[in-house]
């Protein structure tokens, strides 16, 4: 075989070998991905009110090579069931856990007992009980902002009805207490109503108290209030916290006067990022408070508010 023919045969083989080496061993994003991390997410409820937060979590999981497993109490907002779920995940040696606490007092012992398991709470801060980190918002500022918004529609001495829809020690209650303090300081009458989805009982409260405004402090209660207000011309002005598609539609139609739209997509993303870095013993410098904005019908289509109301991945 001539040297020329030999070179014609060997050179392509060398080229293919080099190409294979580049594809198999050259630096690239997929070759620098960390090992897959399993992460359990213990929710407060199973409806669509955490959908945007869940999208944020799923986007972070995709970016950071994390596999999420969502766990939901059979009864919405059951701290007792959350304790059981948390203890089960810890005993099963879950590498990392996200928890949206329903009640700090009920969950405190289980959180403290989590030990070496990476545990990050979302919405309600439990670092004082031993959680590794918390992704939350300034609940006092949020509650005060809602109270201030409601004051615009309620004259001095007028009554504002606050919905207590999530009993227990949690971030949602912090919002309610902050709104109550501000409204009372500014001369408004405040009534607190324990919301139980009983529309008949609520209608009686409206008839007796005759509030000028109602404030809901989490998305589930605000969604139900918006539905109750449908077609009711005499319904009080409605304010609340939440930014689901249903709430945005109610705001657009005027059934909700103003909302505190929280960047829950960002909260979900940051929670997974924090837990992943801590579980992998990577550097994590903490996260700033999750932002929110008071949004009215006339401001809902500004570019900044669009990102809060209609987050996209």
What do the predicted segments below correspond to?
Residues 8-24:
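Hydrophobic membrane-insertion alpha-helices, especially the h-region
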Residues 38-56, 60, 69-79, 102-104:
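Extracytoplasmic "Venus flytrap"
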Residues 49-64, 142-146, 170-189, 224, ...:
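Short, solvent-exposed amphipathic alpha-helices that sit
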Residues 99-115, 194-248:
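Hydrophobic alpha-helical
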Residues 266, 270-313:
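Hinge/cleft segment of the Venus flytrap/periplasmic-binding protein
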């Amino acid at each position: 075989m001539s040297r020329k023919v030999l070179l014609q045969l060997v050179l392509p083989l060398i080229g293919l070998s080099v190409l294979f080496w580049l594809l198999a061993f050259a630096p690239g994003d997929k070759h620098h991905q960390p090992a897959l991390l399993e992460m359990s997410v213990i929710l407060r409820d199973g409806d669509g009110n955490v959908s945007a937060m869940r999208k944020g979590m799923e986007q972070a999981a995709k970016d950071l090579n994390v596999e999420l497993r969502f766990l939901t109490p059979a009864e919405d907002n059951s701290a007792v069931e959350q304790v059981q779920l948390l203890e089960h995940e810890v005993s099963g040696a879950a590498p990392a856990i996200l928890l949206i606490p329903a009640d700090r007092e009920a969950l405190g012992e289980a959180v403290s007992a989590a030990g070496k398991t990476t545990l990050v709470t979302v919405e309600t801060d439990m670092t004082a009980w031993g959680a590794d980190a918390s992704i939350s918002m300034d609940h006092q500022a949020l509650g005060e902002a809602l109270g201030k918004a409601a004051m615009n529609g309620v004259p001095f001495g007028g009554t504002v009805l606050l919905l207590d829809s999530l009993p227990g020690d949690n971030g949602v209650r912090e919002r309610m207490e902050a709104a109550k303090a501000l409204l009372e300081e500014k001369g408004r009458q405040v009534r607190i109503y324990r919301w139980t989805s009983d529309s008949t009982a609520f209608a009686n409260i409206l008839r007796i108290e005759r509030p000028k405004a109602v404030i809901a402090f989490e998305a589930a209660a605000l969604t139900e209030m918006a539905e109750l207000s449908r077609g009711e011309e005499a319904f009080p002005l409605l304010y609340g916290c939440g930014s689901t598609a249903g709430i945005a539609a109610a705001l657009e139609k005027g059934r909700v006067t103003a909302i505190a739209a929280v960047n829950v997509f960002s909260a979900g993303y940051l929670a997974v990022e924090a837990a992943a870095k801590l579980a992998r013993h990577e550097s994590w410098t903490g996260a700033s408070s999750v932002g929110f904005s008071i949004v009215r019908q006339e401001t809902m289509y500004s570019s900044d508010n669009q990102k809060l109301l209609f987050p996209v991945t």
